Amino acid sequence: MKLLGLSLLAVTILLCCNMARPEIKKKNVFSKPGYCPEYRVPCPFVLIPKCRRDKGCKDALKCCFFYCQMRCVDPWESPE
């Protein structure tokens, strides 16, 4: 019983430390200008992503969910 209580205390302390310093998790958030294209396409399944963030795309391309997959696409200038 003491081991369970000690484990819960340790987990609580670790979670509090993580919440007290959120800047560590999102240190270098990088987003390219423009908006992701929005097309309503029904996806029966999601394909393996070709990118994870804008930083992984060449030139002015953005990493967006497009045709059931995260991929590098030309961004829109406005959201409309």
Swiss-Prot record:
It is found in: Secreted. Residues 29-76 form the WAP domain. GO terms for biological process: defense response to bacterium. PANTHER family: WAP FOUR-DISULFIDE CORE DOMAIN PROTEIN 8. GO terms for cellular component: extracellular region. Disulfide bonds join C36-C64, C43-C68, C51-C63, C57-C72. PROSITE patterns: WAP. The gene is Wfdc15b. Constitutively expressed in kidney and epididymis. This is WAP four-disulfide core domain protein 15B. Residues 1-20 form the signal peptide. Pfam families: WAP. Keywords: Antibiotic, Antimicrobial, Disulfide bond, Secreted, Signal.
